[in-house]
């Protein structure tokens, strides 16, 4: 499972890229979606590579992200261990995060909103016009790099 975070805005973005981001449930800057690592999604991720940061997060960071920024699909409330135990088949948020990373379930199937709305990163982006391989923010990240970005955006 990969976490995709849109870091660039819609200015001069082609309609094809906008459509692909909408299909990935990413509708705005600083929104995050979790997508499985299949051939179909790999092609979509490659298409939006110049507008997103993506990588596989660790279970601990995903647990923190769901607890702090996760939202129920309907209604309001905090997503904590009690909510997860009551509304899903998992005992706590850590079990849910593990199932998400193992691609056993999705945020929507678990009763959560399919997108995680994040804050801008504390300390700013490392460069939204430069790929991660050159020290920027765009494109594929290692687990440590995407964990650092998601932690800064909690």
UniProtKB/Swiss-Prot annotation:
InterPro entries: Ribo_uL30_ferredoxin-like_sf, Ribosomal_uL30, Ribosomal_uL30_arc, Ribosomal_uL30_euk_arc, Ribosomal_uL30_ferredoxin-like. GO terms for cellular component: cytosolic large ribosomal subunit. It holds the Pfam family Ribosomal_L30. Residues 122-141 are annotated as: Disordered. CDD domains: Ribosomal_L7_archeal_euk. One of its GO terms (biological process) is maturation of LSU-rRNA from tricistronic rRNA transcript (SSU-rRNA, 5.8S rRNA, LSU-rRNA). Keywords: Ribonucleoprotein, Ribosomal protein. GO terms for molecular function: RNA binding; structural constituent of ribosome. Part of the 50S ribosomal subunit. PANTHER family: 60S RIBOSOMAL PROTEIN L7 (PTHR11524), LARGE RIBOSOMAL SUBUNIT PROTEIN UL30 (PTHR11524:SF16). Belongs to the universal ribosomal protein uL30 family. NCBIfam families: PRK06049.1, uL30_arch. This is Large ribosomal subunit protein uL30. It comes from Halobacterium salinarum (strain ATCC 700922 / JCM 11081 / NRC-1).
